Regions:
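Hydrophobic single-pass membrane-insertion segments
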Residues: 29-42
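Short, low-complexity, disordered segments immediately C-terminal to signal peptides
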Residues: 39-51
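Functionally critical loop-and-helix segments that line ligand-binding/catalytic clefts
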Residues: 49-87, 231-281
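Substrate-binding cleft of extracellular glycoside hydrolase catalytic domains
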Residues: 75-201, 207-209
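Hydrophobic anchor at the start of a short beta-strand
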Residues: 140, 212-214, 236
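Structural recognition of alpha->loop->beta junctions
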Residues: 162-176, 180, 226-250
C-alpha cells in the first residue's frame, strides 16, 4: 500500500513538472510574439482614396466644323488656327504663315531620345523660330517631346525645358508631349500609372515655375495610357487626324492633321484649332 502511494506521488510530481514546463514555454512564446509595450493594436483607420471627377464633356461636335478656304474651321463660333513646329521644318517665313491665317505656334524646345540612353537634346531651331514668330506678331507656346519612364526623368525634362525657355515671353502653355514611338523604344512598356505620374510631375514643375502647363495626347493614348480624370487641372491638346470632332471630352486645342500645307512652312505642317470654352447645348 505504501509503495503504491509512493508511486502515485512520484507520478503527480512528474505531472506537475511537465505542466510547469508547458506553462513556461507558453509564457516565453507570448513574450516573443508580443514583447512588452508591443501589444496588438486595432488597425488605424485609413483615409479614403482620392476620387476624381471625369473630364468635362466636349461641347463641340462634327456639325461645328467645315472646310473654309482650304482649312478646317469652326463655323458655329470663334476659333483660331495655329501650327506646331520643330527643326525638321527648316527655314520658316512667319509673315507668310500669318497671312495664311496662322495666329499661334507651339515650338518644340527639345526632347529626349527614344533609345535606351534616353539623352536630352535641344531643338536647334527653337530660338530662331521664337524670334521669328514673335516678330510676326504670333502667339507663342512651347512643347517638349518626352520619353520619360519615371517621375525622376519627367522632372529632369521639366527643369531642362525651363532652362531652354529662359528669357522667353510665352503667350501660350508649355506642353508635355509624350508619345509612343515603337515596340523597341525605351517607353514601350510604360503603364498608365507611370505615365500619369510623369505627366503630373512635369506639368506641376512647369506651373510652379510660373508658366501655364498643358497635356498633349492622341485618342488611344488618352484611353489606354493616361488617367485623364487626374489631369483635369491642366488643359488638353488632342491629336485626332482626318476625323470629325467626335471626342468625348473637352479639349482646348485640336491637332486635326499632320499633312497640312501652310504658306511659309516647308513640307507637311501640323495644323491646330484653338477651341474656346463654351456651354454644352
Amino acid at each position: 500500500m505504501l509503495k503504491k502511494q509512493d508511486g502515485d506521488l512520484l507520478q503527480l510530481e512528474i505531472l506537475m513538472i511537465v505542466l510547469g514546463a508547458v506553462l513556461l514555454v507558453l509564457c516565453i512564446l507570448v513574450i516573443v510574439i508580443f514583447p512588452p509595450g508591443d501589444t496588438p493594436k486595432a488597425p488605424e483607420p485609413t483615409e479614403p482614396a482620392p476620387t476624381f471627377a471625369a473630364p468635362e464633356p466636349n461641347p463641340y461636335g462634327p456639325e461645328d466644323f467645315a472646310e473654309v478656304n482650304g482649312y478646317l474651321a469652326c463655323v458655329t463660333g470663334p476659333y483660331s488656327m495655329g501650327v506646331d513646329v520643330s527643326e525638321f521644318h527648316g527655314a520658316i517665313n512667319w509673315e507668310k504663315a500669318k497671312n495664311a491665317g496662322v495666329s499661334f505656334v507651339f515650338i518644340r524646345v527639345g526632347g529626349r531620345g527614344w533609345g535606351q540612353e534616353g539623352r536630352l537634346y535641344p531643338d536647334s531651331k527653337a530660338q530662331e523660330y521664337y524670334e521669328g514668330a514673335k516678330a510676326a506678331g504670333l502667339q507663342v507656346g512651347a512643347y517638349f517631346f518626352s520619353q520619360a519612364v519615371t517621375v525622376t526623368e519627367a522632372l529632369e525634362e521639366a527643369n531642362y525645358t525651363l532652362d531652354l525657355i529662359e528669357g522667353w515671353e510665352l503667350d501660350l502653355p508649355v506642353v508635355y508631349d509624350w508619345e509612343y514611338v515603337n515596340a523597341s523604344a525605351r517607353t514601350a512598356k510604360v503603364r498608365a500609372r507611370d505615365l500619369t505620374d510623369c505627366t503630373l510631375a512635369f506639368c506641376d514643375a512647369i506651373q510652379d515655375a510660373g508658366h501655364e502647363a498643358m497635356v498633349y495626347f492622341n485618342v488611344s493614348q488618352g484611353r489606354d495610357l493616361l488617367y485623364l480624370e487626374e489631369l483635369t487641372i491642366y488643359p488638353f491638346w488632342l491629336a485626332m487626324y482626318e476625323s470629325p470632332m467626335n471626342y468625348q471630352y473637352e479639349v482646348e486645342y485640336w491637332q486635326y492633321t499632320r499633312f497640312g500645307s501652310v504658306p511659309g512652312i516647308p513640307g507637311n505642317a501640323d495644323i491646330n484649332l484653338r477651341l474656346p470654352k463654351r456651354p454644352i447645348v
